[in-house]
Amino acid sequence: MTINIADNSPRISYTVAQGQTQTSFAVPFEFFDNADLNVYIDGTLKTITTHYTVSGGDGSTGTVSMSVTGGTGGSTVVITRDIELERTTDFPVSGAFNIVALNTELDRLVAIAADLEDQSNRALQLTDFDAAVSLVLPDVDTRKGKTLAFNASTGAV
């Protein structure tokens, strides 16, 4: 099965209506394994089987069902896809060629590329036309109590 990743963002956010409790959330992007999904409620990462279960996947969309409380009024529920970077299929050097396995493996690679693109688009970046400037931050002890700022000549200070 070939999936169309181009128009599917690997991230969805829900805001639960005030006075309501919601336990079921659609996953409108394709995923392959239940472990491909991360579920956050108000910024807290939840644990699969402890806090939620997943249906669907195997290259299609699905649903996350909260097993305990779910999202309550005003809560923000964010579901992201984060496929583990690994090769799951090994093709034999001779014999029958499994085109279904090849398509699935290629779909996983495209989905991983979409995950990485989503993560990089959410990162602090320089424009393509900026001169080479380092955005490497100082060590944690040097950063403590500091604010990230930019000066008029060299950029980040």
Predicted regions span which residues?
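Hydrophobic beta-strand core residues of beta-sandwich domains
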Residues: 16, 70-71
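A cross-taxa feature marking solvent-exposed loop/turn segments within ectodomains of secreted
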Residues: 32-34, 72, 86
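Short, ordered beta-strand-loop transition motifs
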Residues: 15-21, 53-61, 129, 152
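Short, intrinsically disordered N-terminal pre-domain segments
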Residues: 1-36, 43, 47
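Non-transmembrane elongated oligomeric "stalk/shaft" segments that connect baseplates/barrels to distal
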Residues: 2-6, 60, 74-157
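Non-cytosolic beta-sheet module surface loops
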Residues: 28-31, 43, 68-70, 81, ...
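Extracellular/luminal ectodomains and secreted, surface-exposed scaffolds of diverse proteins
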Residues: 36-70
